[in-house]
Amino acid sequence: MIQQESRLKVADNTGAKEILCIRVLGGSSRRYAGIGDVIVATVKDAIPGGNVKRGDVVKAVVVRTVKERRRPDGSYIKFDENAAVIIKPDNDPRGTRIFGPVGRELREKRFMKIISLAPEVL
């Protein structure tokens, strides 16, 4: 569960290392974001020479959360960290590589480019 002021690790090669959620998209009173949800975030830590700079406001999709999520078959999935992938306005990733596993919920939300770049889909 990601909410305003949550910090997430960036799981791609855009140059950002950490982002801070400033808004959960999907309704005026929406409070939490889970795997596959889009957030607006600001870059808090970045490497020099990357595509994004510290202070940039970006859109990102959540790919891993520490809070467990119940699947329709009754199983639960949770990860060791909160992570997101920075996306363009057309929902394609800005980076060319994805690091670490991503949740299967991204396939249901039609983030196929992220699914194809990810090394593992859980």
UniProtKB/Swiss-Prot annotation:
Belongs to the universal ribosomal protein uL14 family. InterPro entries: Ribosomal_uL14, Ribosomal_uL14_bac-type, Ribosomal_uL14_CS, Ribosomal_uL14_sf. Binds to 23S rRNA. Forms part of two intersubunit bridges in the 70S ribosome. This is Large ribosomal subunit protein uL14. Keywords: Ribonucleoprotein, Ribosomal protein, RNA-binding, rRNA-binding. GO terms for cellular component: cytosolic large ribosomal subunit. It comes from the Bacteria. Part of the 50S ribosomal subunit. Forms a cluster with proteins L3 and L19. In the 70S ribosome, L14 and L19 interact and together make contacts with the 16S rRNA in bridges B5 and B8. SMART domains: Ribosomal_L14. GO terms for biological process: translation. One of its GO terms (molecular function) is large ribosomal subunit rRNA binding.
